[in-house]
Swiss-Prot record:
The protein's name in its UniProt record: AP-3 complex subunit mu-1
Segments forming domain MHD: 176-417
Single annotated GO MF: small GTPase binding
Membrane topology recorded in Swiss-Prot or TrEMBL: Peripheral membrane protein
Role noted for this protein: Part of the AP-3 complex, an adaptor-related complex which is not clathrin-associated. The complex is associated with the Golgi region as well as more peripheral structures. It facilitates the budding of vesicles from the Golgi membrane and may be directly involved in trafficking to lysosomes. In concert with the BLOC-1 complex, AP-3 is required to target cargos into vesicles assembled at cell bodies for delivery into neurites and nerve terminals.
Cell compartment(s), UniProt: Golgi apparatus; Cytoplasmic vesicle membrane
Principal location class: Golgi
Organism: Rattus norvegicus
SUPFAM superfamilies in alphabetical order: Second domain of Mu2 adaptin subunit (ap50) of ap2 adaptor (SSF49447), SNARE-like (SSF64356)
GO cellular component: axon cytoplasm; clathrin adaptor complex; cytoplasmic vesicle; cytoplasmic vesicle membrane; Golgi apparatus; postsynaptic recycling endosome
Family stated for the protein in its record: Belongs to the adaptor complexes medium subunit family.
Keywords tagged on the record: Cytoplasmic vesicle, Golgi apparatus, Membrane, Protein transport, Transport
GO BP annotations listed: anterograde axonal transport; anterograde synaptic vesicle transport; endocytosis; intracellular protein transport; postsynaptic neurotransmitter receptor internalization
Subunit structure comment from the entry: Adaptor protein complex 3 (AP-3) is a heterotetramer composed of two large adaptins (delta-type subunit AP3D1 and beta-type subunit AP3B1 or AP3B2), a medium adaptin (mu-type subunit AP3M1 or AP3M2) and a small adaptin (sigma-type subunit APS1 or AP3S2). Interacts with AGAP1. AP-3 associates with the BLOC-1 complex.
């Protein structure tokens, strides 16, 4: 299936390549570089590129391109999913999927790629199995390997490889048995000038940290599971149980993993947590304008909205801005024309505002349209969709584990039009 894999940075340098069958020349990447030059943005490079003798299928992750070379027709999503699994494995092993981390651990990278693909076909892609085959890097292990000349490859075959549950290794033991879940939701929204919602959608994930001994069988139920759309499951989930009862039943992997991702697309279910009052005006034949924005919580949810930042891309005719914030601090870059206001947390009793004058180029025409406000925020212990975990039951083991659920709401692409 996959003949070769090239890792390319944003500068266009191929800093790592791996071949599973015959060696493919780096010149095949010229087709990718041509498509990259034509793209308006790095994220707009075509995922699938056809060449006279190959197909190039790529993903863009953490400022790196993972470019695979295919010689026969295969489902592109199959290859894309595998490339994302490779990037996730690097993230899990090294703490980050960056060029520096990959270069620092290049031997382990090649060992991982050798195990993940067998003659070009996916073999071992589950983190639990890979960590039995190839030990994650540590400072002590790196020192020992440099002295003894040994590698991170394990001495024994993984016990889970022949198991019916490939994502969980056998013989897991913990002194403290714990199961924690993070429900993280991002709001993507567009708010018009009058404050009405043009578009709103919630993207959510449930991340799990499972440290349980033995082979536990878990069931996670929700108060209101029907609001979830387009649910994507970890392979451990029993899909028929979800279809019939809307309960997540699974034997979990050991450690950290993403249990599900989901979407809430019904706009009447999406509550917008903040509002913005704005008055941005530019006078005709004048060298100044007015800038006035106030941000506050839209409804009393009993939770504090924190980590608020407002980013505004001002028109090119703006020279400088003289503003006064009632809370936080702001910066304005006269080169990029980007205004950034770091607000912090807000309370209904004291609404933060940013007011002042905008200096324009003399003689320049009035800007045709006002800039948009891009807002970031975070709300702890709240799932904005209203999703709530009802209970977690465990079967197959006799001990009583520690259980916990944490909710976080964040702004995704949250834009206010002025």
């Amino acid at each position: 299936m996959i003949h070769s894999l090239f890792l390319i940075n944003c500068s266009g340098d191929i800093f790592l390549e791996k071949h599973w069958k015959s060696v493919v020349s780096q010149s095949v990447c010229d087709y990718f570089f041509e498509a990259q030059e034509k793209a308006a943005d790095v994220e707009n490079v075509p995922t699938v590129i056809s060449t006279p003798h190959h197909y190039l299928i790529s993903i863009y992750r953490d400022k790196l391109f993972f470019v695979s070379v295919i010689q026969t027709e295969v489902p592109p999503l199959f290859v894309i999913e595998f490339l994302h699994r490779v990037a996730d494995t690097f993230q899990d092993y090294f703490g980050e999927c960056s060029e520096a981390a990959i270069k620092d651990n290049v031997v382990i990278v090649y060992e991982l790629l050798e195990e993940m693909l067998d003659n070009g076909f996916p073999l071992a892609t589950e983190s639990n199995i890979l960590k039995e085959l190839i030990k994650p890097p540590t400072i002590l292990r790196s020192v020992v390997n440099s002295i003894t000349g040994s590698s991170n490859v394990g001495d024994t075959l993984p016990t889970g490889q022949l198991s019916n549950i490939p994502w969980r290794r056998a013989g897991v033991k913990y002194t403290n048995n714990e199961a924690y879940f993070d429900v993280v939701e991002e709001i993507d929204a567009i708010i018009d000038k009058s404050g009405s919602t043009v578009f709103a959608e919630i993207q959510g994930v449930i991340d799990a940290c499972i440290k349980l001994s033995g082979m536990p069988d878990l069931s996670l139920s929700f108060m209101n599971p029907r609001l979830l759309d387009d649910v994507s499951f970890h392979p451990c989930i029993r899909f028929k149980r979800w279809e019939s009862e809307r309960v997540l039943s699974f034997i979990p992997p050991d450690g950290n993993f993403r249990l599900i991702s989901y979407r809430v697309s019904s706009q009447n279910l999406v509550a917008i947590p903040v509002y913005v009052k704005h008055n941005i005006s530019f006078k005709e034949n004048s060298s100044c304008g007015r800038f006035d924005i106030t941000i506050g919580p839209k409804q009393n949810m009993g939770k504090t909205i924190e980590g608020i930042t407002v980013t505004v891309h001002m028109p090119k005719v703006v020279l400088n801005m003289n503003l006064t914030p009632t809370q936080g601090s702001y910066t304005f870059d006269p080169v990029t024309k980007v205004l950034a206001w770091d607000v912090g947390k807000i309370t209904p009793q004291k609404l933060p505002s940013l007011k002042g004058l905008v200096n324009l180029q003399s003689g320049a025409p009035k800007p045709e349209e006002n800039p948009n406000l891009n807002i970031q925020f975070k709300i702890q212990q709240l799932a904005i969709s209203g999703l709530k975990v009802n209970r977690l039951d465990m079967y197959g083991e006799k001990y009583k584990p520690f259980k916990g659920v944490k909710y976080i709401t964040k702004a995704g692409k949250f834009q206010v039009r002025t």
